[in-house]
Amino acid sequence: GIPVCGETCTLGTCYTAGCSCSWPVCTRN
């Protein structure tokens, strides 16, 4: 839930390991 992945996922995909898409940004925990 913390937006620390430094990645956006406007297309719905995160490439950073351990991160999930909480549109429009990737989050971890």
From Swiss-Prot:
Record keyword Ion transport present: no
One GO BP: defense response
Position(s), cross-link Cyclopeptide (Gly-Asn): 1-29
Intrachain S-S bonds: 5-19, 9-21, 14-26
Keyword Nucleotide-binding: no
UniProt-listed InterPro entries: Cyclotide, Cyclotide_moebius_CS, Cyclotide_sf
Post-translational modification, as annotated: This is a cyclic peptide.
Cross-referenced SUPFAM superfamilies: Cyclotides
Keywords, sorted A to Z: Disulfide bond, Plant defense
Free-text domain note: The presence of a 'disulfide through disulfide knot' structurally defines this protein as a knottin.
Function: Probably participates in a plant defense mechanism.
Entry similarity comment: Belongs to the cyclotide family. Moebius subfamily.
Name of the featured protein: Cyclotide vinc-A
Organism, scientific name: Viola inconspicua
